[in-house]
Amino acid sequence: MVHPEFPVVEGRYQMTSDWAVTLPQRFNRRIEDGSLVFWRPGITAWTVVWNNDNGESQQERLEWLRTDTSPDAFDAQFFTDGDVTRYSYRLTERRDEGVVHALHGFAIGVDGHVQMAIYFDDEADLETARAICRSLDETDTI
């Protein structure tokens, strides 16, 4: 059940003028600490959209992101989908309240990239997290 005091989004959602995401279920939406956050019980996606201010190629940005990846990362995936290069990896984080699973995903487009960290309590939500990352779509390129 989503929180009644926050906006609810589902399906295709235009995050910025350049990037959209498709959410497979109803999620609440908020802005927190400069991030766009989508959440529902058991799964939370923290999202930041970056511009390509330095005019770097997708490959240059991918290499930079790869060098900044945690040494604890596993299950890394790379692929190109149309004009978007995708990179993701998993982390398992141990916190005071227990184990939290995470999928960190990047969609690298012509004019920028999206960074998304999706945290989920139940390993069964991994496919939902992957579907959200795969749905990131650059909608307006110059």
Question: What are these model-predicted stretches?
Answer:
Residues 41-43, 50-54, 92-96, 109-111, ...:
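Short, flexible beta-strand-to-coil junctions
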Residues 30, 57, 98, 125-127:
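Intrinsically disordered, low-complexity acidic/polar segments
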Residues 64-112, 119:
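Signature of long, low-cysteine stretches enriched in small and polar/charged residues
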Residues 10-68:
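Secretory pathway targeting signatures of secreted, lumenal, and periplasmic proteins
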Residues 25-27, 114-142:
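Surface-exposed amphipathic alpha-helical segments
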Residues 1-11:
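Short acidic N-proximal helix/loop "leader" segments that mark the beginning
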Residues 8, 23, 101-104:
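A generic local structural motif
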